[in-house]
A protein has these predicted regions:
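ER/Golgi luminal nucleotide-sugar-dependent glycosyltransferases, focusing on the catalytic module
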Residues: 1-172
């Protein structure tokens, strides 16, 4: 299962993502940040799922099946740590071992991007990294998209338009 996390008011981002995906997916749209959506999946999804943010544009999608075929947890990238940007394949069995905090603001979401994902990885033990080259330090540049300056992370499979990369304090 593919899960796309979004927030009301980000329909342009979601449309770009969905039109490039061309696959069935579950869209979760609320104000709970990434961990709120992952927590929803923990409670309602009983099989591994691939979590993506709405700011991803897919160039191809066959690689998604290849990663699911590994039958294990797979982090999309490891920058700034495993499951950077929270994206990757999560196993509900592992999720049931890890408490998921309620995130109140963007600063907390960024903090837990390292703290919580490290806890998940510790329980999962053997986590693959799909695209270690997707790193802020290897960004292809910056681009204004839908009124927001983004750091552009890109490889042959996808483009991620990253809104926060340490350029300013995260304020909601």
């Amino acid at each position: 299962m593919i899960v796309i996390g979004t927030t009301p008011g980000r329909e342009n981002w979601l449309n770009d993502c969905l039109s490039s995906l061309n696959r069935p997916c579950l869209v979760l749209s609320d104000f709970s940040y990434e961990l709120g959506k992952i927590n929803w999946c923990k409670k309602h999804v009983n099989k591994p799922f691939f979590f993506f943010q709405d700011s991803v544009v897919f160039k191809s999608t066959d690689w998604i099946d290849e990663l699911f075929d590994r039958k294990k947890s797979v982090a999309l990238t490891n920058d700034p740590s495993f499951y950077g940007m929270y994206m990757g394949i999560y196993d509900p069995i592992i999720l049931n071992m890890v408490e998921i905090p309620k995130v109140e603001n963007k600063a907390e979401a960024i903090k837990y991007e390292i703290e919580w994902t490290n806890k998940y990885v510790n329980y999962a033990i053997d986590v693959d990294i799909a695209f270690p080259e997707l790193r802020d330090s290897r960004a292809s540049g910056k681009e204004v998209r839908h009124g927001r300056e983004c750091l552009v992370l890109e490889n042959e499979y996808l483009i991620k338009y990253k809104g926060n990369w340490g350029q300013k304090p995260a304020i909601d």
